[in-house]
Amino acid sequence: MAPWTRDEEWFREARRRLVERLVREGYIRSEHVKRAMLRVPRELFVPDELRHLAYEDTPLPIGHGQTISAPHMVAMMTEYADLKPGMKVLEVGAGSGYHAAVMAEVVAPSDEPREHWGHVYTIERIPELAEFARRNLERAGYADRVTVIVGDGSRGYPEKAPYDRIIVTAAAPDIPGPLIDQLKPGGKMVIPIGDRYLQHLYVVVKTRDGKIESRPVTPCLFVPLVGEYGWREYEADTTLA
């Protein structure tokens, strides 16, 4: 079947098979992450010419040197974040908007009353990608649960701080100070740290008394976090692929 003839039912079945695989492989461990990934149509968050690849477990290019993360990484980061309904989340690196939509389905589930909803704020430094994410989220039905901001994600988004959870989808040389400041006591951050050749995904916890505890959980490979508290443009070109 040609990619352009695939219909909604085909994508729904492909999504179901992918989610079942991620459950078997241990990336999806909770019912709420499973439900979120079954509900969010990844085919609406990739370029049209790549829609037929939406349910391959691989990153896909979305333009401007950026990618949409592989589904297993989205599942893993969402599980490590330990999201709950009603939480306020900051995502650094909106990309295509897919990961924000998955998180929105956890913190603001479609079948829950609006008064119980949390919200996802996602910040993107590339204006064209921010607009791409905004359009994708709107057509997928998440515009009222996700706010897209154009800006330097390494500085966070203090206007809506503090956050219960912060998810960073680009690799930083170290944990940006503003993100630590904007994390609630008792909150968690999931962030890739490292250079071009060696990165690890870290889970960072701010304890109730404000102490910071962090632990690496898995090797990974992300595009660079470019910004005042990340990599400079010229460093990103030579430090991270």
Curated annotation (Swiss-Prot):
It comes from the Archaea. Its main location: cytoplasm. GO terms for molecular function: protein-L-isoaspartate (D-aspartate) O-methyltransferase activity. GO terms for cellular component: cytoplasm. Catalyzes the methyl esterification of L-isoaspartyl residues in peptides and proteins that result from spontaneous decomposition of normal L-aspartyl and L-asparaginyl residues. It plays a role in the repair and/or degradation of damaged proteins. Belongs to the methyltransferase superfamily. L-isoaspartyl/D-aspartyl protein methyltransferase family. Its EC number is 2.1.1.77. This is Protein-L-isoaspartate O-methyltransferase. Gene3D superfamilies: Vaccinia Virus protein VP39 (3.40.50.150). Keywords: Cytoplasm, Methyltransferase, S-adenosyl-L-methionine, Transferase. The lineage of its organism: Archaea, Thermoproteota, Thermoprotei, Desulfurococcales, Pyrodictiaceae. SUPFAM superfamilies: S-adenosyl-L-methionine-dependent methyltransferases (SSF53335). It catalyses: [protein]-L-isoaspartate + S-adenosyl-L-methionine = [protein]-L-isoaspartate alpha-methyl ester + S-adenosyl-L-homocysteine.
